[in-house]
């Protein structure tokens, strides 16, 4: 997503992304608007926690606006990432992998209840300040300046200032990667949390792999925690 050359060509090209407020994150939307996909089979896999609110239909509409013919959109239900557990339907993933391999044309169905949920969400958001989500994070005195938060942030919205993490509003996607990866749980929310101690790291992806995949300009190399390996 950080490449200057955004022309991609392959037999199959897919986007796997979470949904925030029933839609793909802003940076994913911007990527789709700028990129060119030269493929006969473009697909999207969207992950969600509480409810999807018609995410497949919204993603299909986004692709149409971007001039991207999308052949397949499916949803993967995960437990909300506020909780320190991981729940993914392995059987559903197997079906998705088979569908994509066979180039199945299918868009996940959307109900009127899904659409109503999204409209209710939008109505609630209109009551909040436009930049409310940009001020969701704070850094406590527990910060040890390891730099992990800076390296896992996909939008360069957190940085080290005098060996202490500092959140930078403006481009924050509120993915909470910084909060979940902090070894001291020093990245907290500015609003009450159901469980302030609940943090989750995918056991199938090492922190080093996450950092290397992210590769933010200006970030240092993979950090070392007290335990040594990240």
Q: Model-derived features: where do they sit?
A:
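Fold-independent oxyanion-binding glycine-rich loops
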Residues: 17, 156, 170
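Charged, low-complexity surface patches
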Residues: 52, 142, 171
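Short secondary-structure boundary/hinge segments and terminal tails
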Residues: 81, 161, 190, 199-200
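Iron-sulfur cluster-binding cysteine motifs and their immediate structural context
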Residues: 138-139, 144, 148-167, 177-194
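FMN-binding flavodoxin-like domain, especially the glycine-rich phosphate-binding loop
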Residues: 1-132, 195-197, 204, 208-230
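A charged, amphipathic alpha-helical module
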Residues: 114-146, 156-161
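Short Fe-S-cluster ligation motifs
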Residues: 171, 175-191, 205-222
């Amino acid at each position: 997503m950080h490449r200057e050359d955004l022309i991609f060509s392959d037999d199959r090209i897919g986007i796997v992304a979470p949904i925030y407020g029933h839609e793909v994150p802003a940076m994913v939307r911007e990527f789709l608007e700028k990129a060119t996909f030269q493929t006969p089979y473009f697909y999207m896999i969207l992950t969600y926690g509480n409810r999807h609110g018609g995410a497949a239909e919204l993603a299909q509409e986004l692709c149409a606006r971007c001039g991207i013919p999308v052949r397949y959109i499916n949803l993967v239900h995960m437990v909300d990432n506020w909780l320190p557990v991981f729940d993914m339907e392995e059987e559903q993933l197997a079906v998705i992998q088979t569908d994509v391999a066979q180039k199945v044309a299918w868009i996940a169905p959307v109900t009127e209840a899904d659409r109503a949920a999204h409209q209710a969400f939008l109505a609630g958001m209109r009551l909040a300040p436009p930049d409310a989500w940009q001020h969701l994070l704070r850094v406590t005195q527990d910060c040890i300046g390891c730099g992990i938060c800076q390296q896992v942030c996909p939008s360069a919205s957190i940085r080290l200032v005098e060996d202490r993490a500092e959140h930078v509003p403006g481009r924050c996607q509120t993915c909470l990667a910084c909060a979940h990866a902090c070894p001291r749980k020093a990245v907290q929310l500015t609003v009450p949390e159901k469980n302030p101690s609940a943090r989750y790291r995918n056991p199938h992806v090492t922190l080093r792999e996450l950092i290397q995949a992210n590769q933010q300009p200006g970030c240092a190399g993979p950090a070392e925690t007290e335990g040594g390996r990240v």
